[in-house]
Amino acid sequence: ILEQEELDALIGEGAEGLVTDSTDDVRGGGEKYDFASQEYAVSRLIPALSQVQSSLAEGIKQQMRQWVPSVDNIRADRIAVMKFAEVMRSTAAPAYIVSMRADPLGSPIYLAFEAELVFTLVDHFYGGRGRSQHVRAQDFSPSESRFMERLTESLMPAITAAWHTAVDINPVIDEHYHDFRFVDELQQSDTLMVTRFTVQIGTHEAELMSVVPWAADRKSTR
């Protein structure tokens, strides 16, 4: 769990990722913590976020079951630190991506559902067995998009509860995308903390992904 001083530095004014040897002129704790250092991230930020993502897996599972009772399990993989360019290359389009404003975090956070998961969820919801006829679609159908809009909106309380272990946020969906290339809030060189979740629905497995910008502290609203 991050200490209050660390949270203030991460999300508040003065969080510039700087390190100083003097603590007399530290304002809000921002200069005490080098958020950009790998050592700091491994020792503090990633463990805190790992707890968030473990809670998120359980919360999403419970909420998804309200829509698709055959969702058996969701398991979170280890957090991977990746450049946005890598995320774009490794995420096939279409994917159902939601950008969420998460005050008081200083930058959006994201959930991305791979196409196979979208097709399987929609097929089960409408009474099928998850045997989607889609091999590779250029985009989602209107009914698939409407279903995912409703599903992702219903996940907001689960996201709030999961983040409560680290910081209280109020997530609100800002945008929906079907391709990471159209996410204009991120630059290719931006560093992200990425967690993949494997969703088991009957005999099918598919993935969704949580994306948290590493540099949220440097993008905080002033």
Q: Where is each model-derived feature located?
A:
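N-terminal auxiliary interaction/assembly segments of multi-subunit proteins
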Residues: 1-222
